[in-house]
Amino acid sequence: VAIEQLEQYAPEVIDSFKELSKTGSVEFLAEPYAHSLASVFDVNEFERQVKMHADKLEQLFGKRPTSFFNTELIYSDEIGEIVSKMGFKAMLIDEAKHVMGWKSPNYVYKHAYVSKLKLLVRNHKLSDDFAFRFADLSLTAEKFISWIAGLPAEENVVNIAMGYEVLGV
């Protein structure tokens, strides 16, 4: 589990996260503790792991998460309903072209029948560009920022998400 590895082998990273948390501009998202597929196979185990992770984040950073990130961004309306019942206000989901069609990921959406759950859609293209093209220097910060600045004005939410492995963790 990444958070346990950071605590044991890189406590300075946890300390830097604590400093980020103090700014009030960052929220750490809850997820299944073991990065498991429990949301698909075992609701009770899923809820147990999510609570365990939310408890750990609250213990470390002094704030209980209100947003959720499922393993590999797995989503269904049923999973969203469970997440909402657990008290989360928002869930980060992947941009599924076969579902979204022409819709942009750069808006806040809502659950199909639990309207209080906000759905934040990962911008697949920008996330992958950041994750895979910065490291080999084929993408510069200036170019990346220009892409975001070039989005239509009404598309004012851009969610970039990637795993810790991108950062070498």
Sequence positions of predicted segments:
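Conserved NTP-donor binding/palm subdomain of two-metal-ion nucleotidyltransferases/polymerases, i.e.
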Residues: 130-133
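Active-site-proximal acidic segments at structured loop/helix or strand boundaries
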Residues: 154-162, 167-169
